[in-house]
From Swiss-Prot:
GO CC terms, sorted: cytoplasm
GO biological process, one term: L-histidine biosynthetic process
Record function comment: IGPS catalyzes the conversion of PRFAR and glutamine to IGP, AICAR and glutamate. The HisH subunit catalyzes the hydrolysis of glutamine to glutamate and ammonia as part of the synthesis of IGP and AICAR. The resulting ammonia molecule is channeled to the active site of HisF.
Pathway: Amino-acid biosynthesis; L-histidine biosynthesis; L-histidine from 5-phospho-alpha-D-ribose 1-diphosphate: step 5/9
Origin species: Bradyrhizobium diazoefficiens (strain JCM 10833 / BCRC 13528 / IAM 13628 / NBRC 14792 / USDA 110)
GO MF term list: glutaminase activity; imidazoleglycerol-phosphate synthase activity; lyase activity
Keywords: Amino-acid biosynthesis, Cytoplasm, Glutamine amidotransferase, Histidine biosynthesis, Hydrolase, Lyase
Gene behind this protein: hisH
Assembly with partners or alone: Heterodimer of HisH and HisF.
Residues annotated as domain Glutamine amidotransferase type-1: 2-216
Protein name (record): Imidazole glycerol phosphate synthase subunit HisH
Catalyzed reaction equations: 5-[(5-phospho-1-deoxy-D-ribulos-1-ylimino)methylamino]-1-(5-phospho-beta-D-ribosyl)imidazole-4-carboxamide + L-glutamine = D-erythro-1-(imidazol-4-yl)glycerol 3-phosphate + 5-amino-1-(5-phospho-beta-D-ribosyl)imidazole-4-carboxamide + L-glutamate + H(+); L-glutamine + H2O = L-glutamate + NH4(+)
SUPFAM superfamilies named in the record: Class I glutamine amidotransferase-like
Amino acid sequence: MSIAIIDYGSGNLHSAAKAFERAARSLEDPQKVFVTSDPDQAYGADRLVLPGVGAFADCRRGLDAVNGMVEAITEAVRVKARPMFGICVGMQLFATRGKEHVITQGLNWIGGDVEKITPRDESLKIPHMGWNTLDVLREHPVLNKLPLGPKGQHAYFVHSYHLNAANEADVLARADYGGPVTAIVAKDTAIGTQFHPEKSQRFGLALISNFLRWKP
């Protein structure tokens, strides 16, 4: 089994790779983790990870600049039904559009727009940086046995925008930051988190481990 972390010039590749390697070691079946900017290698992997930090438009341009990568991951996920994990802006790229400064087309795997978060409490700063618990909207195998809810473990967020999904069924969990913030989305074999699981300590590691066990 192999896990490809997509390198398109954005994302905490080293941190993500280390987190997935650590989670993979906890499984009964060995899984190889590798970072790649080669579309053929990405397409050939059993699971894919799309990290991302920075502005939506910059990340989309970076992904488009890797010749054949959008086509490869779209074929792998949407046609071959291989599991994909999006992290932060990597998850946002699943959306129909991003509205950060300019309108930018996303991958359109999950209907909806990436919009600026607008806390009701004006004292809450943007970007949203820090630890939050998650409120689960629906069950999913990747959330199995995780300590969620108001008394659950915390996830680490650093962002100013979130995915406002068109279909409520595509949202697995939200956080509260002066109002609801989309935290986890999933549709078919694609799942993504607005927070950084690689920085979320034991909770993040458990979430990644569940993703690696998931057989959609």
